[in-house]
Amino acid sequence: MCIRDSKKAYVYAIENVVTGLLFGAPHDDFDFIISEENGIPVIMECYPDAFRLSFKGKKCSIYEISDEGFMRGVTSWSPEFVSENEVAVVREIAVNDLYSRLLDEESCGNLIIRRYEDAEDYKSIIAEHIVDRLVRFDAVYTEDKKIKKHYGKIIDALKDIMDGHLL
């Protein structure tokens, strides 16, 4: 069971195995934007080399479970199902090299990886996402070294805007 934004204990599940694999290693909203296009998971790097840094050398397991008792629409992310009850594992699939597996899924057309681009349109999408997350998660004054390293200029600009001098 896991407790997240809802503050309620849920078992979280996703139908698409490849999307599930994207959660096989620790990362957060400051590393990627995860979405879907025509049923195919899409992962956009929020900074250069985020994909490799997050998944290389990582192992994970994904679990096939019964869909009984799962509800859709409880969380803000449409691919996600939740259950308030513990569920039995039907089958475990061990993944010994998550990075290679995800690259294989990309080459088979089952995953779209948008690697970081030094292009204004790409960076604009990422900047909008990061600003939203910094404000939403009250992270403007964070001490997190990774966030400060990649988004220090955005954080400084937000602090400048939020100090009240523009009112």
What annotation goes with each model-predicted range?
Residues 1-3:
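Short, small-residue-biased leader/transition segments that mark boundaries at the very start
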Residues 5-29:
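Extended catalytic/binding region for NAD+/ADP-ribose chemistry, centered on the ART fold
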Residues 24-167:
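Conserved NAD+-utilizing ADP-ribose enzyme module
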